[in-house]
UniProtKB/Swiss-Prot annotation:
One of its GO terms (biological process) is tRNA pseudouridine synthesis. Substrate binds at residue 112. The active site is at residue 54. Formation of pseudouridine at positions 38, 39 and 40 in the anticodon stem and loop of transfer RNAs. Belongs to the tRNA pseudouridine synthase TruA family. Homodimer. This is tRNA pseudouridine synthase A. InterPro entries: PsdUridine_synth_cat_dom_sf, PsdUridine_synth_TruA, PsdUridine_synth_TruA_a/b_dom, PsdUridine_synth_TruA_C, TruA/RsuA/RluB/E/F_N. It is an enzyme of class 5 (isomerase). The keyword rRNA processing does not apply.
Length: 248
């Protein structure tokens, strides 16, 4: 009998062309399905994720599901997958899920984090894991601006022109930031995120911190529903899909 398996995984997005499978490109989904096909003796197994991540974007807590006829315990699945996956993907947790569980459609909220290193000199070892930003920032102004991001808004100004969904209203439950030595970490929890939304919000908030735009410009951007009213898109390497929230 077929079983539905739910996995939580981490990956370093540096050497992937994103999560979603692309012909001739190295992707997270491609690596997962390659290993599962080997385990199923050549039978193709389709993997479904909570959402896609772009090239260079990392995941601390991505969630996937797939269906299988193999009779392995969750612990056996975890060991078998980790033994065959490349070292930039790690399966952290495996559970047998209810057949109705869906990694994407059962998700109630997602948490993204974005890391910015505020220092004059670049760190060669951190260059793929945070955004190097050598400018002084007004932290108080940025916190005020972040509070305006919280709540239910139309995020048309804060998503890529490539966004292919018509309903761009999302609810952000938490938009916060904290300093850890020279590392500034943004945290966003919401019921859904549009294409490049977190990276555009971060780029905009950094412009507030640098004095390039006012705190009020956040409200104006929401009203305008026009990408040109928000700031630059922050680069991919600072972004992490941190956690996916489900009812259970």
């Amino acid at each position: 009998m077929s079983k539905r398996i739910k996995c939580t995984l981490s990956y370093d997005g540096t050497h992937f062309f994103g999560y979603q499978i692309q012909p001739g490109k190295r992707t997270v989904q491609g690596e997962l399905e390659r290993v599962l096909e080997q385990m199923h003796k050549g039978k193709a197994i389709r993997v479904t994720a909570s959402g896609r991540t772009d090239a260079g974007v990392h995941a601390y807590g991505q969630v996937i599901h797939f269906d299988t006829f193999l009779s392995l315990s969750p612990d056996q699945w975890k060991k078998a997958l980790n033994a065959q996956l490349p070292d930039d993907i790690v399966i952290k947790d495996v559970q047998e899920a209810d057949p109705s569980f869906h990694a994407r459609f059962s998700a109630k909220a997602k948490e993204y984090r974005y890391k910015v290193r505020i220092a004059q000199e670049r760190d060669v070892f951190l260059r793929n894991y945070c955004y190097h930003y050598p400018y002084p920032l007004d932290m108080e102004a940025m916190r005020h601006a972040l509070r305006l991001i919280e709540g239910t808004h139309d995020f048309t100004s804060f998503c890529s022109a490539k966004t292919d969904v018509d309903d761009r209203v999302r609810t952000i439950y938490k938009a916060d930031m904290a300093m850890h030595d020279d590392l500034l970490e943004f945290c966003f929890i919401g019921n859904g995120f549009l294409y490049n939304m977190v990276r555009i919000i971060v780029g905009t908030i950094l412009e507030v911190g640098q004095g390039k735009r006012s705190i009020d410009s956040i409200s104006h951007a929401f009203e305008a529903k026009d990408r040109q009213f928000a700031g630059k898109t922050a680069p991919p390497q600072g972004l992490y899909l941190w956690k996916v929230y489900y009812d259970n």
